[in-house]
Amino acid sequence: LYLKDEFGVETRLLRPPGGCFTEEALKKAGELEYKYVLWSWETDARDWAGTSASVIASTIEKNMHGGDVILLHDSVVGKSHTAEALRILIPYLLSEGYSFDTVSGLFSEE
């Protein structure tokens, strides 16, 4: 509701911050017809912590499985190596037969 009120953007997707949620929060999300989205913990490359591009890429490469959702952050001022890691990861994952989709796209396929 905050996004709509503040920015005029409407969504029905909810990612619990840090992956932490309560049953009450899930119940309320369901009442509001939100779909909650969790990511694959094994692929958490901690890109938000200033991790190098090579470590981000290798963490995901080693731990990736079909159907995983990878959580990456678009920027952390002065510390983000995520874009550089994606230049490594995308060609590698495509060569391994993986494909990419948005979270909204995954839900629209249900």
Regions found by a protein language model. Give the residues of each.
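Amphipathic, non-transmembrane alpha-helical secondary structure
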Residues: 1, 23, 53-65, 83-91
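Catalytic-core regions of hydrolytic enzymes
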Residues: 1-9
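His/Asp/Glu-enriched short active-site or ligand-binding loop at hydrolase and phosphoryl-transfer sites
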Residues: 10-12, 20, 26-63, 97-109
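Divalent metal-coordination and catalytic microenvironments
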Residues: 14-17, 36, 70, 93
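Active-site glycine- and acidic-residue-rich loops that bind
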Residues: 18, 46-50, 77-84
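Short beta-strands and strand-loop turn motifs
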Residues: 38-42, 69-74
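C-terminal domain-boundary segment and adjacent tail
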Residues: 80-110
